Design a protein with these regions (language model features):
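Phosphate/Mg2+-binding loops and adjacent switch elements
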Residues: 1-77, 81-83
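Glycine-rich phosphate-binding loop signature in dinucleotide/nucleotide-binding domains
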Residues: 2-5, 157-163
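Short, conserved loop/helix-junction motifs that constitute active-site signature segments
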Residues: 18-19, 48-53, 74-77, 104-106, ...
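Hydrophobic residues at beta-strand termini and immediately following loops
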Residues: 27, 84, 137, 187
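Short, charged/polar "capping" segments at the starts of alpha-helices
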Residues: 63-71, 120-121, 172-176
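Short, flexible loop segments at boundaries between secondary-structure elements
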Residues: 89, 140-144, 180-206
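Redox- and metal-dependent alpha/beta enzyme cores, enriched for Fe-S-associated oxidoreductases
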Residues: 92, 96-98, 103-147, 201, ...
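A short, acidic, amphipathic alpha-helical segment used as a generic capping/interface helix at domain edges
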Residues: 144-161, 170-172
């Protein structure tokens, strides 16, 4: 019905019965194998040796240093590797989708909250645009917000003098757009390919 010609499936690598054209395997640059244990004892869905099935490896949250130990040993020789990071794309007001330019947050006191797997990533991105994070509340991943949570967020934000409340797109979809009386914005993030864009395009777009 929507004339779709490409389907991207999250967590599809370990679904061996799935017919696919390209296997893209993501490694977190900070913790590529977690604690090295398989689920439920660790974060791995399959043994590390199965990385050799990938057609392309994408190192996420790349910080400019060398690869962490182990990635090179687990992937096939000559496998293309792409390096990427997250960047702030836009800020949209929760109740109107009005756009706020990132430069307007420079030096401004903000309160932020999120319920994502790597909450420090969100804080780091806010600090990169020079926002002054005066309150930061990370909730558990996939957190379902209660009215008490939201009241506490706003009360703390007002107490510490925040002018804005910020959250992620992932969290914003769980909120009533009118949850806050302070100006509240959802932060849209974009993946930036630092190295290997041509390789990525060749595998994904061709």
């Amino acid at each position: 019905h929507f004339d779709v010609d490409t389907i991207i499936l999250d967590d599809g690598f370990q679904h061996l019965g799935l017919k696919r054209d390209t296997n893209i395997l993501l490694f977190d640059h900070q913790r590529p194998f977690g604690n090295g244990q398989l689920f439920p004892a660790g974060e791995l869905r399959e043994p590390k040796r199965e990385a050799r099935r990938a057609d392309l490896v994408c190192v996420t949250r790349y910080s400019g240093s060398n690869y962490p130990p182990g990635i090179g040993e687990q992937v096939s020789k000559g496998m293309p590797i792409v390096k990427s990071t997250l960047r702030l794309d836009s800020l949209l007001k929760l109740d109107s989708n009005e756009v706020l330019e990132a430069k307007n947050l420079r030096g401004q006191p903000v309160a932020a909250f999120c319920g994502i797997a790597n909450p420090e990533d969100f804080r780091r991105i806010l600090e990169q645009i020079r926002a002054r994070v005066v309150d930061y509340h990370p909730f558990p991943d996939h957190h379902e917000y209660t009215s008490a949570d939201l009241r506490a967020i706003e009360e703390t934000a007002r107490r510490v003098g925040a002018k804005y409340i910020l959250t992620t797109e992932k969290d914003a979809v769980k909120l009533n757009p009118n949850s806050f009386s302070l100006p509240a914005y959802k932060v849209s993030l974009d993946m930036e390919i630092l190295e290997g864009r041509e390789v990525f395009n060749r595998h994904v777009l061709n």
